[in-house]
Amino acid sequence: MALCNGDSKPENAGGDLKDGCHHYEGAVVILDAGAQYGKVIDRRVRELFVQSEIFPLETPAFAIKEQGFRAIIISGGPNSVYAEDAPWFDPAIFTIGKPVLGICYGMQMMNKVFGGTVHKKSVREDGVFNISMDNTCSLFRGLQKEEIVLLTHGDSVDKVADGFKVVARSGNIVAGIANESKKLYGVQFHPEVGLTENGKVILKNFLYDIAGCSGNFTVQNRELECIREIKEKVGTSKVLVLLSGGVDSTVCTALLNRALNQDQVIAVHIDNGFMRKRESQSVEEALKKLGIQVKVINAAHSFYNGTTTLPISDEDRTPRKRISKTLNMTTSPEEKRKIIGDTFVKIANEVIGEMSLKPEEVFLAQGTLRPDLIESASLVASGKAELIKTHHNDTELIRKLREEGKVIEPLKDFHKDEVRILGRELDLPEELVSRHPFPGPGLAIRVICAEEPYICKDFPETNNILKIVADFSASVKKPHTLLQRVKACTTEEDQEKLMEITSQHSLNAFLLPIKTVGVQGDCRSYSYVCGISSKDEPDWESLIFLARLIPRMCHNINRVVYIFGPPVKEPPTDVTPTFLTTGVLSTLRQADFEAHNILRESGYAGKISQMPVILTPLHFDRDPLQKQPSCQRSVVIRTFITSDFMTGVPATPGNEIPVEVVLKMVTEIKKIPGISRIMYDLTSKPPGTTEWE
């Protein structure tokens, strides 16, 4: 069989196969095609007591066979199988007699190798969907004929390869194929993530029933492994740990304290000016109770005026650099994160100097988690993952320190829920372990900074599509070319649901002139936000349905919000100039305080994984004839429920959170001077990330 996607085999193909000296009898190899969820597959397999190892997609088939792997799982990825830059792989992996499960991109690879075709279709699927399954197929044994799964793809199988049959469908789209005699299976959805309700059953069927794994691999004691790693790397040196007070950095510090002598650990909390109300004070008090002495540094001024070096442009491949604007004049989310991350390191170096320590003898410790590295496309996590957003603890400067071996990240293979379990094993108090996550850059990435509106050429047409969707029951009576596009992108079931919703409720749907970061098809997207308003009381189930449907039809939208209050008559087309100034931050800080205080008092904080409160530069309810300038801002409440922060869903008012709790938040936030409207984020992940930036 010929080599695929490349004229010759890459020089390093198979070179990362653990030096070729290991034997993995009974284990599963995960070939990494660059999916954001690659490490989640590894984790899910190990949860089922089967050993798994992650190797590059280009690993040759003979190496996999020689190493004794029992089965192969191919991850998803951001590429198209027909793209010129599609990653190379050895097609013989499908013919060495090993059971193969191809996920998303992996399924498309499998189909193409055996003569099938893959096309980029008009319908993009990003979110949770009901799909039909053939539950007589070994992979789906024990499941219902309809299951809820996560789909996130633009390319779809068109012609199914000879010898394969379709075993799952999402409407008219192929969602699963199988050649049972050869034990080759492909699924377009992601069984590894929590949003696929019975994904674990599918993986168990593959591992046990199809591949014949024994399930005798038990996970090592992670705490002891972390402590061993810290001792081995640090020796007698000092470690500077940057403490935010959140669960990640606190567990990291507790591990350092357990592994090293107390005088080796220097715990520093840097108040960057973007903390929540009274945050630094409460952090210091909480950690003192744990016996951890913390040096608190007020560095707000340094951060507000911080800069970093950046490439001349995104297209410039030369090493030439430019100095960024100061943080308080920067609007780019990526540049904000990079400035904040590099300023953290600069201040850490200043602390080292003030304490008369030798920089070459001091390590920097961080509570970096696996999702941080995956979303930053760090090689530590995945060789091919597409950049979603730069994390403040995985900037270019941090990566340089990491290459020099100067960064300690004992939690780099952990997900959030695993860190909480580890924290309990370390006897940390429950109130600290169960805290909602708060990003290191703090409120800085919860302010949507902008000088001008985000309006591209597709703005008017997209707005017209949204009008058709919001008034679908009336639109079907007036044939329009865009109506045909809407119908082409939706199933009959979707259209029936749209008819029902729009005939019962009076809705407006329109674009907001701002952009937020999302993840669509394993790639980063900076896209529009769709706003929905209504004169009726919100029907939350219907709104959640629309939030799933709209990004599927309009690929330039990655987030949908409901706007509280009367119908929006004139959607804003300009923005209030917004930067990271003290006044802007004070407004958001108060809104965040009010919302979280109400959530805590309601007793529902434990039901919600995280609740970012976002300040946007949008001023509603202005009469265009009076030409009133945009001077107010609006707040978004982003409830989020997840087990691993790789995928998740919003809390539906009336289900996971009482409607009256949400309305109380709206009432209290509206009292803050300068607030125009309150919005509720209806978006799952994907297509929207947890944070807006």
Swiss-Prot record:
GO terms for biological process: GMP biosynthetic process; GMP salvage; response to L-cysteine; response to xenobiotic stimulus. XMP binds at residues 337, 522, 610, 685, 691. The modification Phosphothreonine is found at residue 318. The modification N6-acetyllysine is found at residue 9. Its cofactor is Mg(2+). ATP binds at residues 244-250. Residues 27-216 form the Glutamine amidotransferase type-1 domain. It is found in: Cytoplasm, Cytosol. Catalyzes the conversion of xanthine monophosphate (XMP) to GMP in the presence of glutamine and ATP through an adenyl-XMP intermediate. This is GMP synthase [glutamine-hydrolyzing]. It comes from Rattus norvegicus (Rat). The lineage of its organism: Eukaryota, Metazoa, Chordata, Craniata, Vertebrata. The gene is Gmps.
